[in-house]
C-alpha cells in the first residue's frame, strides 16, 4: 500500500468494469481539492469481501476515508465488517429504495452484530419494503426516512447521515432516468441533484469514516448516464469532506447550550449548536455507558429544536432516547 500520510480519501474499485467507468467520468471533473489529498488504489484483483475487509481496516486505522465503488450490493456488508477489529460501537446509515429482513444486511441483524449500535435507512419506498421489515427496524429504534419525506425537505435527512460512522449508498435509490444501470430500475427515487446533496452532507460529517457506492450494472447503463451520476455523487462527497468544520462534538467546547424544559418527559432536554457550522445536536439526558459516550450527542436540526420548545419531538429523536 502506498504512503498515505497526506491523503484524506482513497478510491477502491471492486469490479474492474464498474469502477473504471465511474473513474473515467470522475477524472473529467474539475479537481479543486488539495494536491495529493485523494489517492486511487485501483481495483481489487477479485470482487471478494475477504480481500476488501483488510484493505478497509488498514485505511480506517490510518484515518483515511475509503470510498468503495462496487457493483455487487452484497459487498456493502463487508464495509461494516471492516470495523470489527476496532472493537468500537458503530452507527451505520444506508440509502436504498428498500430493506428486506433476508437481504444484504440480514447477517448483521440475525442475531444483531455486537458492534452495531445504530442503523438508519433513508430513501426507502414503502411500496417496495415488506411491512415486517419496517416493523423490525421500528422496534429496534432505528431511523427510517421515507423517500417522500426526504425529498420534501432534503435538509432534514442531513442529521441522519451526520450520525453515521459509515454510509452505504445503493444506486437503486435513484430514479431510472438518473441511474438506469441498476438491477431493478424504478421510476421513483432521488434525482441526481438530491443524491449529490446527500453525498455532500455525508462528506461534511466529521463522524463519517467510510463511504460505499453500490449496485452499478454497466451492461444496463444507457449512454454512460449512471457512471456520470455516480461520478458526480463522489465529487460532491469529496467537496463535503474538504469543507468539514471540525465541530464533531467529542466535547461541548465551542458549542452553545440551549436548555428546553420538557414537562411531558419530566426532565429538561439540552440542545447544542455549533458556531462553526450552525448544526445542532440533542444530548441524551441520561447517564450513558462509556462505550456509548461517543453517540450521546445525537445530530438534529433547528426545526427539531423548535419542536422541542413546543414540547414536541420528532419520532427520530424519540427513538434516539429509547436507544440508551
Per-range role (PLM):
Residues 1-213, 217-324:
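Conserved alpha-helical scaffold segments that buttress catalytic/binding sites
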Amino acid at each position: 500500500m502506498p504512503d498515505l500520510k497526506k491523503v484524506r480519501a482513497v478510491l477502491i474499485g471492486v469490479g474492474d468494469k464498474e469502477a473504471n467507468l465511474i473513474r473515467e467520468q470522475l477524472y473529467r471533473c474539475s479537481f479543486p481539492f488539495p494536491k495529493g489529498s485523494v489517492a486511487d488504489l485501483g481495483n481489487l484483483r477479485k470482487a471478494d469481501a475477504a480481500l476488501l475487509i483488510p484493505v478497509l481496516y488498514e485505511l480506517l486505522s490510518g484515518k483515511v476515508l475509503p470510498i468503495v465503488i462496487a457493483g455487487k450490493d452484497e459487498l456493502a456488508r463487508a464495509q461494516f465488517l471492516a470495523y470489527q477489529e476496532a472493537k468500537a460501537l458503530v452507527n451505520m446509515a444506508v440509502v436504498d429504495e428498500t430493506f428486506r429482513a433476508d437481504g444484504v444486511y440480514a447477517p448483521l441483524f440475525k442475531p444483531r452484530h455486537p458492534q452495531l449500535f445504530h442503523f438508519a435507512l433513508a430513501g426507502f419506498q414503502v411500496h417496495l419494503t415488506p411491512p415486517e421489515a419496517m416493523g423490525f427496524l421500528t422496534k429496534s429504534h432505528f431511523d427510517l426516512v421515507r423517500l417522500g419525506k426526504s425529498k420534501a425537505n432534503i435538509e432534514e435527512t442531513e442529521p441522519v447521515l451526520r450520525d453515521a460512522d459509515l454510509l452505504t449508498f445503493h444506486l437503486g435509490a435513484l430514479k431510472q432516468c438518473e441511474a438506469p444501470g441498476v438491477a431493478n430500475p424504478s421510476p421513483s427515487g432521488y434525482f441526481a441533484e438530491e443524491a449529490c446533496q446527500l453525498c455532500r452532507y455525508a462528506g461534511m460529517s466529521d463522524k463519517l469514516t467510510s463511504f460505499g457506492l453500490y449496485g452499478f450494472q454497466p451492461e444496463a447503463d444507457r449512454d454512460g448516464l449512471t457512471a456520470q451520476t455516480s461520478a458526480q455523487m463522489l465529487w460532491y462527497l469529496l467537496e463535503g469532506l474538504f469543507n468539514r468544520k471540525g465541530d464533531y462534538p467529542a466535547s461541548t467546547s465551542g458549542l452553545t447550550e440551549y436548555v428546553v424544559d420538557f414537562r411531558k418527559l419530566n426532565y429538561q432536554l439540552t440542545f447544542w449548536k455549533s458556531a462553526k457550522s450552525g448544526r445542532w445536536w440533542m444530548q441524551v439526558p441520561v447517564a450513558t455507558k462509556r462505550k456509548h459516550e461517543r453517540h450521546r450527542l445525537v445530530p438534529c436540526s433547528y426545526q427539531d429544536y423548535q419542536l422541542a420548545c413546543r414540547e414536541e419531538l420528532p419520532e427520530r429523536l424519540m427513538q434516539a432516547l429509547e436507544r440508551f
